[in-house]
Amino acid sequence: HEIELIMDVAKETLQSLTDSNAATDWVNKYVTPYSQDVNFKYIAVGNEIHPNTNVAQYILSAMTNIQNAISSRKFTIKVSTAIDSTLITNSYPPNDGVFTSDAEPYIKPIINFLVSNGAPLLANVYPYFAYANDQSIPLAYALFTQQGNNDVGYQNLFDAMLDSIYAALENVGASNLQIVVSESGWPSEGGAGASIDNAGTYYANLIRHASSGDGTPKRPGESIETYLFGRCLSENQKQVLILSVIFGLSLPISS
């Protein structure tokens, strides 16, 4: 399979991209020269931008301008933004997931943009962080090695986290919006449960699960388009994760 990439827009660039000419220049500089050789699947305008930060106000305008520049060049790249699980509250059971009161007014116009452009919402889903923050969560549940379902019908933490985001989308009337998992990973050292063995188990099982077509309880029978994060999760440890994950790139694991 050809490698497909998610291209991130640097956080410090977001404000300038609210100017349409700057967005056109950005596409001309970073996308157009490489478009024949690189398969850009998505452009992520902002990665884990929180609603109460200064740059949040620039996201939708920057997305719109980048999309217009992309469309004018007849590229088929989809423009989105990547959220993380901190924008979701009441995430267990997953069916109760909703956007936080801060996140809802931020995300709703973005959702409308995505729906109108046929683009998915990008979401970074890290069972590791949930496990590290609450070690009453069984490690096997986080690593896809638990046998049988838990009391709300879930066999693994990844599905539960993903479905809580789907529930939040349903709650704001966006039940048809697809989620693409733009990052997922497990560290090989540096924290509770972080080891080469656990990382290897997580990646192997995630790849198997995402490509199986089983889907999640809320979205059964679908492959889960998922990209692996290619660096250690700890920002001060830059070693490459095990498996053949290319440093600093997200690699697709679904066709």
UniProtKB/Swiss-Prot annotation:
Catalytic residues of the enzyme: 48, 183
Enzymatic class: hydrolase
Similarity annotation: Belongs to the glycosyl hydrolase 17 family.
The keyword Transport belongs to this UniProt entry's keyword annotation: no
Origin species: Glycine max (Soybean)
Name this protein carries in UniProt: Glucan endo-1,3-beta-glucosidase
GO MF assignments: glucan endo-1,3-beta-D-glucosidase activity
Lineage: Eukaryota, Viridiplantae, Streptophyta, Embryophyta, Tracheophyta
InterPro entries: Glyco_hydro_17, Glyco_hydro_17_plant, Glycoside_hydrolase_SF
UniProt keywords, alphabetically: Glycosidase, Hydrolase
EC code: 3.2.1.39
Catalytic activity of the protein: Hydrolysis of (1->3)-beta-D-glucosidic linkages in (1->3)-beta-D-glucans
Pfam families: Glyco_hydro_17 (PF00332)
PANTHER family: GLUCAN ENDO-1,3-BETA-GLUCOSIDASE BG1-RELATED-RELATED
A biological process from GO: carbohydrate metabolic process
